[in-house]
Amino acid sequence: MSGAAAFGNIFRIPELKKKVFFTLSLLVVYRIGAHIPTPGINSVALAEIMSRMTGTMMGFFDMFSGGALSRLTIFALGIMPYISASIILQLMTMVSPYLARLKKEGEQGQKKITQYTRYGTIVLSLVQSTGISVGLEAMRSPTGNAVVLEPGWSFRIMTVLTLTAGCAFLMWLGEQITERGIGNGISLIIFSGIVAGTPAAIFQSMDLMGTGELSVFIMLFLMFFMAAVVGMIVFTEGGQRRISIQYAKRVVGRKMMGGQSSHLPLKVNTSGVIPPIFASSIIMFPATIAQFTTHPWMQNISAMLTPGTFVYSLIFIGAIFFFCYFYTAVIFNPVDVADNMKKHGGFVPGIRPGAKTSTYIDEILSKITFYGAIYLSLVCILPDYLIRYVNIPFYFGGTSLLIIVGVSLDTMQQLESHMVMRNYDGFMKKGKLKGRQG
C-alpha cells in the first residue's frame, strides 16, 4: 500500500485520529510558547550575542530548545532539566533500596518515581535558571548594549520563576502526549524543536553559499553525506538479531498444544535515541551555566565542552556507551524473558531453559548493544567534526539527524500498530525488518 493511502487510514480510525490531533495541538502550543519572550530582556543585544554562539555548546542547547534559548523565551530551558532528573532517578534506583522497591511495585511505584522526577525537574530548573539570570546581568553585546534592561533581584526572581514554570509546563505537555497522544512526548518535543529550526538553517547555508563562504561542491558533498547518514540510521534501526525459539508439545485437555517454532527479536539499537539525548543532557547542564558566567575557569569549561572538541567527544562517547547498556537493562530483562519462555514451554535449541537461557540471551544482548553504541557514537560524532570545520549550522549535526529519523520511525511504528490492530494497512511492509537468525 502507498504511503498516502496508509496516511489516509489514520483518519478512518476515530480514536487514532483523536490521538494524532491531540499530539499536534500540544506541539503547536509548545511552538507558540517558544516565541513568548522572558520579561526584562533587550532582545536586540541578546540576538547580537547569540549570533556569535554558533558552533558552541550554547548553539547545541539552542537546537534542543527549538531556538527558545537564543530568544530567551519562557521555554528557554527546554525539556533538558526533566531528562536530567529522569537520569538521576533511574541511577538512584540502582543504589537506593527504597527506590528499587518502588520500581518493583508496578504502576503505583512508578507513579511515585514519576512524582520524584517532577520534584527533581523543578530543583534543577531553579539551579539552571538562577545561573542564567545572574549571568545575563553581566552580559553585553559587541556594541556595548546590556542584555538586561533593569538588573537586580526583581529581574532575577522573575526570570527564575518564568523559566522554571516554562520547564514545568513543557514537562506536563510531554507527559500528556505520552499518555493521551501518539509517540513519546519528551522525544517529540525535542524533535519538533529541531524540525522547526531546520528551514532557518537551510537558508543560513544558502546565504553562506551566496557570499562565497561555502562552495557549491562542499554543500553537495555535505548533502550526500547527510543522506548517507540518514540511510545508515534507517538501516541500522531496523536491524535485529533473532534468537530461535522452539515450543515443546504438550497435551492440554484433549488437544496437543505447542510444537511450533518462533523467534525472539533483539534490536541492534534497543535503546533507540535515548542514549544521545541523555548524554547531551548530562553535558549541557554544566555547560549552559558555564556559558552564562564571566569567570575565566568557567569559560574554559564551556570551551572544552563545545561539540567537535576532543574532551566533548570523549565524554559524549563514554556517556553514550554507558546509557546504551544502562537503558537496555532498564527496558529489557533477560531473566524475565527466560522465565516466561519456560512457563510457556519454550526453549532455545541447545540451551537449557531457565538460568542458562537468560545468560545466553544476556550475552547476545551485550554484544549487539556494544555494536549499537558504536553506531550511535559514529552517527553523532563524525558529522559534528565535519560540520565544525565547514561552518555549517548544528541543525545538520549527527545528533539532530538521529533524533529526527529515530523519533519519526518510532512514531510511525506506533501508528502502524494502531492501524494493524484495527485491520488497516500501515506504512511498513511485512518482513521489512532484517535480522540475523541465531
Report residues per predicted region.
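N-terminal cationic and glycine-rich segments that engage phosphates or anionic surfaces
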Residues: 1-103, 108-438
